[in-house]
A protein has these predicted regions:
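Cytosolic, long alpha-helical scaffolding segments
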Residues: 1-120
């Protein structure tokens, strides 16, 4: 994600910048699922409490990095359109996801799919 954002910024590539927000959304979903799975491991004793702090901190940091990358990409897109209402832009993107956004999100979801726990 960082490479995608840096490349989009350095190359002033809005197509690449538009691919950052779908990845940020997926990272949030994956982090929530990983936190849920971790709680299950804590409850059944397969993971210790101390490990949980480091794991949770790692996931929180990943979400923060994703949010920062999203902010850079959104600023690029907003600057290009001569509008600079980042929160309004993100709200509209998240509620009115176009076909390109959904396709990009689906591609990322396939690429970064978590293992199915029911088969283990």
């Amino acid at each position: 994600m960082v490479d995608l954002t840096v490349d989009a910024f350095c190359e002033d590539n809005l197509e690449m910048a538009a691919k950052v927000e779908p990845l940020r959304e997926l990272i949030g979903i994956l982090c929530n699922e990983l936190k849920t799975r971790h709680i299950g491991r804590l409850q059944d004793g397969t993971c210790e409490f101390q490990q949980g702090f480091a794991f949770n901190d790692l996931l929180t940091n990943l979400e923060r990095i994703a949010a920062h990358c999203s902010n850079v990409a959104v600023a690029m897109i907003e600057t290009d359109s001569d509008e600079f209402d980042t929160h309004e832009y993100l709200k509209s993107v998240r509620h009115m996801k176009d076909a390109a956004y959904l396709k990009c999100f689906d591609n990322y979801a396939q690429k970064y799919k978590l293992a199915d726990l029911s088969s283990q």
